[in-house]
Amino acid sequence: MSALRIWLMQALLIFLTTESIGQLVEPCGYIYPEFPVVQRGSNFTATCVLKEKCLQVYSVNATYIVWKTNHVAVPKEQVTVINRTASSVTFTDVVFQNVQLTCNILSFGQIEQNVYGITILSGYPPDIPTNLSCIVNEGKNMLCQLDPGRETYLETNYTLKSEWATEKFPDCRTKHGTSSCMMGYTPIYFVNIEVWVEAENALGNVSSEPINFDPVDKVKPSPPHNLSVTNSEELSSILKLAWVNSGLDSILRLKSDIQYRTKDASTWIQVPLEDTVSPRTSFTVQDLKPFTEYVFRIRSIKENGKGYWSDWSEEASGTTYEDRPSKAPSFWYKVNANHPQEYRSARLIWKTLPLSEANGKILDYEVVLTQSKSVSQTYTVNGTELIVNLTNNRYVASLAARNVVGKSPATVLTIPGSHFKASHPVVDLKAFPKDNLLWVEWTPPSKPVNKYILEWCVLSENSPCIPDWQQEDGTVNRTHLRGSLLESKCYLITVTPVFPGGPGSPESMKAYLKQAAPSKGPTVRTKKVGKNEAVLEWDHLPVDVQNGFIRNYSISYRTSVGKEMVVRVDSSHTEYTLSSLSSDTLYMVHMAAYTEEGGKDGPEFTFTTLKFAQGEIEAIVVPVCLAFLLTTLLGVLFCFNKRDLIKKHIWPNVPDPSKSHIAQWSPHTPPRHNFNSKDQMYSDANFTDVSVVEIEANNKKPCPDDLKSLDLFKKEKISTEGHSSGIGGSSCMSSSRPSISSSEENESAQSTASTVQYSTVVHSGYRHQVPSVQVFSRSESTQPLLDSEERPEDLQLVDSVDSGDEILPRQQYFKQSCSQPGASPDVSHFGRSSQVPSGSEEDFVRLKQQQVSDHISEPYGSEQRRLFQEGSVADALGTGTDGQIERFESVGMETAMDEDISKSYLPQTVRQGGYMPQ
């Protein structure tokens, strides 16, 4: 269905197009008015009327009409359907111009087709022309001008009409936008003419008021020509002018207007009109400056003033004649004090006179120096300075400029003596820019002033200050610097009052003609960095890069991730302390300097705050050290006060054998061997061996010979308890038995024990082995004997033992190896070794229990008994079943004593790696 509809629409469109092409001459309708021109601000209504033929062909009526302006549909509120063939549209307060209004229909209710279109024009009717005037240029047609009034936005025609009383002249037509019209004829002088203007457009037409005039009163003469200027040698202040007037001068009387100016000036000077009111062709201008070039121009008008001034003539110039200078040059001096004391080098300087004051070409200058009442010295100088050597006295210098006519008035300058002290400076000196000039203002001193000398120079660190100067009259207290001044440069301005007796004290200040932002910013650095603060410092910017007065500095600092902080610092400061910073933190900082015209940033600088504040580590370390020192001191004092107790536990008193009374216990018992302990001790360079008992872990069974001696050890222990002592308790490791060396010399050198073994008093004969040589040496120890050795009960025990019948058997303490197969061949044996039957394991257990009980019951000498018991147990141990050998090393040296030998403690002497006495 939709495809069929599309096909029908296309066929209908082709049909309508064919019909419309064939009937272009006859549209389906029309709009009236067809050429509307609407006055702006009014209402306008257009009506579209459809023809009956179109109604039938396109099956439409007036309700199918669509209005458009410039292809934009008009709102339905403005459309009115009059009947089935007509529809109207209304526009209120029309302001548009050149709008295309079209009437369209929707054929078959869908296809839009244009029926008719018109263009709507809007505008205003013409205003009455005003200010109508006419001018008659000499030798040309009359030109009239008018004011057409407001813009009409429509095509408007202006017609200029003129007539005599009996004759009309051709019209002059012009269109809107042109305010003048040239008449096509030359008017006749002395005959009045009437002129008016008519204006017309689609909305109406108007006429101006007519004007009536004589063309001679509207004439504009041609400008004067051939203007010339000449000077006079007699008078240097006049110039003579001559010219030729226009051709009307023969018909009309003309007066002239003369103006002049100096060559470099921009404004003209008017010659009074009353001086040129009469017709003339020459004139003399007076009161001019000598030797000055002037420019002149002239124009003319009718003598009665009616009509128009002619155009200005071509300019002509002339120069007045020379005259003597009207003013003395500005005069100043500088004294160089580096010469010997009797002379001064004075530099006299002066300014060139301007042309307006020189009144001619300056040929030279005359300088006269007078010292007190002496003869004057005259110098003729072509330049503007003179260097002379003066004494330390006062001088008076005069200066005059000379040209071809004569000399200028002389200017006098007093050069005071070398001991002169200047005073009375100006006060309240100010300098400020205004109107692109640098002004200087001051308050005069109370003393009368002849003149002021103003000096200025550019301050720079790269070049010297070369001053320029100017002179001002003594009545002046405000002036501007005359010279070529630069912007963004610092000027040092000095004002010196000059009195009749000499110059006063100079007063200086700095100023800028125009300031700018600095060329570079300050460079900041750290002076001191703490934990939470940092002292920043910087240098003042060089004057060459300041470009103005530094008002303030800004310091911007931030961390790598923090917000930037900004502080402002006065321009007089060169350092600033940043506080409330974070410890051990990297900061980035830069500075900017500001003038009144802007600022400039300096380079960025980084620093890191300290982790600890200054003195914080010392505050921690010093108290700790003091506390440690105090603790140590208290400990030392405590140890000193408790030295006896400490000595008792660490270094117990060891009896000195040399002072022992043991020899007095049995004084009647002679020694078995008479020998000198010092002379005969180990005379054969043989040393007592000190052996250490080593029990191999694999030995299970004790040796039979060792088990045999267990019973003897038990019996002997009872009788010897209380008669054995070593060096200092358990640490001395002394045995309750005398030890007999039984190992070879190489074995004794291997012992590294530090315990010194003393002999033990045994009250019985030696039962096992008696060494061939019994050697005792006197102990070199200075340690006292043990307390147990000095007790009286010990002495009684010794006596009772000596008198007893039973003598305890002596036990030998030696290294023994059981005879087992495979024993190490390098193990040393004693020459005599007792063979005992193998004991049972029960005997060994009983022996250990006995040792434990003895150790608990004996507080004194327990270590010696333990060591002795370990030696006895070692003797009792035999060879295990697996054939391994148990090795015993002797830890002491046995001393063989006979039953009738006197009991005494004698230290054992060990050499070459053995035990040395303490």
UniProtKB/Swiss-Prot annotation:
Region forming the signal peptide: 1-22
Membrane topology, Extracellular segments: 23-618
Domain (Ig-like C2-type) ranges: 26-120
Topology in the lipid bilayer: Single-pass type I membrane protein
Glycosylation sites: N43, N61, N83, N131, N157, N205, N226, N382, N389, N477, N552
Annotated GO biological process: cell surface receptor signaling pathway via STAT; ciliary neurotrophic factor-mediated signaling pathway; cytokine-mediated signaling pathway; glycogen metabolic process; interleukin-11-mediated signaling pathway; interleukin-27-mediated signaling pathway; interleukin-6-mediated signaling pathway; intestinal epithelial cell development
UniProt GO molecular function: ciliary neurotrophic factor receptor activity; ciliary neurotrophic factor receptor binding; coreceptor activity; cytokine binding; cytokine receptor activity; growth factor binding; identical protein binding; interleukin-27 receptor activity
CDD domains recorded: FN3 (cd00063)
Ranges annotated as spanning the membrane: 619-640
Cytoplasmic-facing ranges: 641-918
Biased composition (Low complexity): 730-751
Tissue: Found in hepatocytes, astrocytes, fibroblasts and endothelial cells.
Cell compartments where the protein resides: Cell membrane
Residues modified as Phosphoserine: S660, S666, S781, S788, S828, S838
Region (Disordered): 659-679, 720-754, 773-795, 817-842
InterPro entries: FN3_dom, FN3_sf, Hematopoietin_rcpt_Gp130_CS, Ig-like_fold, IgC2-like_lig-bd, Type-I_Cytokine_Rcpt
Cellular component GO terms, alphabetical: cell body; ciliary neurotrophic factor receptor complex; dendrite; external side of plasma membrane; interleukin-6 receptor complex; membrane raft; neuronal cell body; neuronal cell body membrane
Main location: membrane
Domain text: The WSXWS motif appears to be necessary for proper protein folding and thereby efficient intracellular transport and cell-surface receptor binding. The box 1 motif is required for JAK interaction and/or activation.
Protein family: Belongs to the type I cytokine receptor family. Type 2 subfamily.
Protein name: Interleukin-6 receptor subunit beta
Name of the gene this protein is made from: Il6st
